[in-house]
Regions:
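Active-site histidine-anchored catalytic micro-motif
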Residues: 1, 5-53, 58-65
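Mixed-charge interfacial surface used for oligomerization/domain docking
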Residues: 17, 43-106
Length: 106
């Protein structure tokens, strides 16, 4: 649509992967929820687009997350998970799209 001003904030809260081989750097995981809520609340207050973006950037700079799983997921269209987790292990730092983590712990 023409005439609609937009801005973009790339959320990068995942502390497990500072330079992911699957992306251009830190990825957004659970922290995206808080950035969305803060930006939405600011917009609901009637803030300008620039003020909404600034609030989202401040939140993004201060939110950190790390993933943990006891099982791997199977992505749609695939027959098996991208990694496995034994019954006595947990996977730390995996991605939300099935990317393997950085460490397994017993």
């Amino acid at each position: 649509m023409k005439g609609i001003e937009v801005e973009c904030v790339v959320v990068k809260d995942d502390v497990a992967v500072p330079d992911s081989t699957y992306s251009t750097g830190r990825r957004g995981i659970a922290g995206t929820i808080f950035v969305h809520k803060i930006a939405g609340a600011k917009a609901n207050e009637g803030a300008s687009l620039q003020e909404v973006k600034e609030a989202a950037e401040i939140a993004n700079a201060n939110i950190r997350s790390i993933g943990m799983s006891m099982t791997a997921c199977t992505l749609p269209g695939l027959d098996k998970p991208g990694f496995t987790v034994a019954d006595d292990e947990i996977e730390i730092g995996m991605g939300i799209h099935g990317e393997p983590g950085i460490q397994k712990l017993k």
